[in-house]
């Protein structure tokens, strides 16, 4: 599904959107390993790589555990073949990392774009109970849950949310 952009952009970016309908087609081990490899090679401040992901495939106990932390409005994500919880690590042996959340975002974007290149779509969500996720998954204290990602082949796009308009102005030249 191509968007109407004001200037041509990469087709991978142009076709990206966040569906709420996924086909019940599993994500292969080869493919989800590629997603995490793409995330691994993301840039990060001082190469600290302050991200960690927890993932599970549909119809497994781990998937049910991840899904339990979703808010009611994101119950649709339980139909995705793959759920991923992205965490940032805000301090390490070098001290506090003020860019940890930003770096997790870059890593997650790399993961999402790799998924897109493989023919999958993803939907990133903040709508989940972070404390519940920490408790249910027994996360180490330094792993701070920040984003949940549903990934799969796109389902019935006729059911998708109507597209939202994009900002007309998002940058200003400084002279």
What are these regions (language model features)?
Residues 58-63, 90-92, 131, 155:
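Short, charged/polar surface micro-motifs in flexible loops or helix N-caps
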Residues 16, 137-139:
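Conserved acetyl-CoA-binding loop of GNAT-fold acetyltransferases
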Residues 4-5, 9-11, 18-19, 26, ...:
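C-terminal helix-cap and adjacent tail motif
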